[in-house]
Amino acid sequence: KSSAITSKTILFFYPKAMTPGCTVEVNEFQSNFNKFQKLSFTIIGCSKDSIENNIKFAEKYKLRYLLGSDLTNVCKKLGIWIEKSMYGKKYFGIDRSTFMIDSKGKLFKQWNKVKVKDHVKEVLEIAKNCP
């Protein structure tokens, strides 16, 4: 079974389900779901959370797109599993990132170190020019 993406896709990685920034991000993609759909995009969100936590997250906000759980270290392979620091404590986590894949399955645009505010609006603008 192939895991290749072969259609226009927005694949975004968020650090942790149910946290404030991630909640805003998934809901922004949800609010713009129809606009992305009109541009023929599939939306997929992904984190290192368990499948159960992502199901709860999707159900809580009635998301109309899929959330995936990175159980095979895709984050590491994409270079977005990074060392972070909070309150002086170092740990590894996801660098909030978004990947836009075109209709041929090629990377069209990549965002790293995403700031949630206005991000989805920017992604939507770029999506209008994605083949």
Language-model segments: what does each one mean?
Residues K1-P131:
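Chalcogenol-based redox active-site neighborhoods
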